[in-house]
Amino acid sequence: MKKREDMTEMQVHVCLNQGTEYPFTGKLLDQQKKGLYRCVVCHSPLFVSDTKFDAGCGWPSFFQAISPEAIRYLDDYTLSRPRTEIRCGQCDAHLGHVFEDGPPPTGLRYCVNSVSMAFEDSETGELIEG
């Protein structure tokens, strides 16, 4: 588990303070390699690359979590319309939000801050923090 003092300023802002990175700025937005997306704080698996798609919204988007336990869902009323916040199911780090405008087969769009994830390349094992 990553300690607060070992996190970047942006990781603290997003993961611990429910912030949002600017759209189209995240390191993992255009990641096309095969692999696993993990929580940057506790390294729990969140998404597989096969479920990633280009939603055009500026943040990495996925249509399905790796397992039902991987994600925790919370009602979010901080903006003018209700949303569903998503957090890591293991450490409770803020990840982003989920919307019901995604592609088949789920119809869901998990809109995730790059900085809240680390990508593990399935070929090399390299871990790249967003």
From Swiss-Prot:
A GO MF term: zinc ion binding
Pfam family, one: SelR
Root EC class: oxidoreductase
Signal peptide: none
InterPro entries tied to this protein: Met_Sox_Rdtase_MsrB, Met_Sox_Rdtase_MsrB_dom, Mss4-like_sf
Positions of the catalytic residues: C111 (nucleophile)
Cofactor dependence: Zn(2+)
Cofactor note: Binds 1 zinc ion per subunit. The zinc ion is important for the structural integrity of the protein.
Domain MsrB intervals: 1-122
NCBIfam families: peptide-methionine (R)-S-oxide reductase MsrB
Similarity field: Belongs to the MsrB Met sulfoxide reductase family.
HAMAP family referenced in this protein's UniProt entry, alphabetically: MsrB
UniProt protein name: Peptide methionine sulfoxide reductase MsrB
Gene of this entry: msrB
